[in-house]
């Protein structure tokens, strides 16, 4: 799985997951366009809270 992480003011949050890198890259662009106040990037690991909520 590939995860999209959101970082803003030292806060880290996993916002989405995708089975393929191609899908994740396409959505990463959308996240970056829709919210310019945070930094979005791809990761192979989710944040701790993501695993707890799944």
Locations of the language-model features?
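N-terminal acidic leader/helix
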Residues: 1-30
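Short, mixed-charge low-complexity intrinsically disordered segments
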Residues: 13, 25, 29-54
């Amino acid at each position: 799985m590939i995860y999209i992480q959101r970082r803003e003011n030292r806060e880290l949050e996993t916002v989405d997951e995708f089975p393929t890198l191609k899908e994740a890259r396409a959505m990463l662009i959308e996240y970056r366009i829709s919210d310019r106040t945070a930094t979005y990037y791809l990761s192979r690991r989710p944040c701790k809270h993501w695993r707890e909520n799944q």
